[in-house]
Amino acid sequence: MDRCTSSFLLLTLVSTLSILQISFAQLVPAIMTFGDSVVDVGNNNYLPTLFRADYPPYGRDFANHKATGRFCNGKLATDITAETLGFTKYPPAYLSPEASGKNLLIGANFASAASGYDDKAALLNHAIPLYQQVEYFKEYKSKLIKIAGSKKADSIIKGAICLLSAGSSDFVQNYYVNPLLYKVYTVDAYGSFLIDNFSTFIKQVYAVGARKIGVTSLPPTGCLPAARTLFGFHEKGCVSRLNTDAQNFNKKLNAAASKLQKQYSDLKIVVFDIYSPLYDLVQNPSKSGFTEATKGCCGTGTVETTSLLCNPKSFGTCSNATQYVFWDSVHPSEAANEILATALIGQGFSLLG
């Protein structure tokens, strides 16, 4: 799917609802976001962690060329999704000063770069572990009740879409680089451990009142530029064993989601397949108007992420990120996020009713 087709599909979705005189904003009163760097909009700016993106060249193509803490040159897939759903403002990062008063009526973002399903890894990285993100969600609900009243707050949370992006950091930044974990878990057993934590998370946010939940699958982790550099050795193309691990994890994730769906009759849960559209972009970049899919735009594009390597002094940063599938060695560019957002919207219609 090229970028023109992607934009046309997004426009068609909005136009169809306009014809039907249905407002996405009415159907989706708020968006709550949990997880990792793929969806963090600035919470890590307020933490003593290396995993931050509140400095150039991050954000150079965002509004006012501002580095907000998003791990991207511009908009995240969730930003584009929010716009498509009729939001004129993005739900604020929960730790930011903007997360107060009426701004909370449209939701909040609790995500934290370097977080994931493995809370111990998140704590080591000085990120917000998933259990703490749930605690912030509970705190958010208390604030919302004070602003809108108990009945309205319950309605907002029940009607909100809750998005979760997690798992990539657990494998790429934790399991694959931590010999101690090898002694405790096989990759399959570690995946099962993460799935147990996923199920716990769903039950916890359900208890707070969430009823519409979308969780992203693992991407083709073996195709991330950093993974090629660190784990590819002499293998050409994507690292096949990492992609196989991701596919096996995704099968477990879908099975767990189906089980939870049966367990809670009023729960709507969708597993967004991010693997397929991103894999297609990497394998056939020119089909979608890209010229580079093996490395990121920032610096050499092979290992750069966070301030350690992707910063204003990074040598070799590209001038036009729209030609790159990846912005840094881990995260997609805004141009790629536009295509991923189309996949999110297309797969998530059941959450809008």
UniProtKB/Swiss-Prot annotation:
Residues 1-25 form the signal peptide. InterPro entries: GDSL (IPR001087), GDSL_lipolytic_enzyme (IPR050592), SGNH_hydro_sf (IPR036514), SGNH_plant_lipase-like (IPR035669). Keywords: Glycoprotein, Hydrolase, Lipid degradation, Lipid metabolism, Secreted, Signal. Its main location: secreted. It is found in: Secreted. GO terms for cellular component: apoplast. It comes from the Eukaryota. Belongs to the 'GDSL' lipolytic enzyme family. This is GDSL esterase/lipase APG. It comes from Arabidopsis thaliana. The gene is APG.
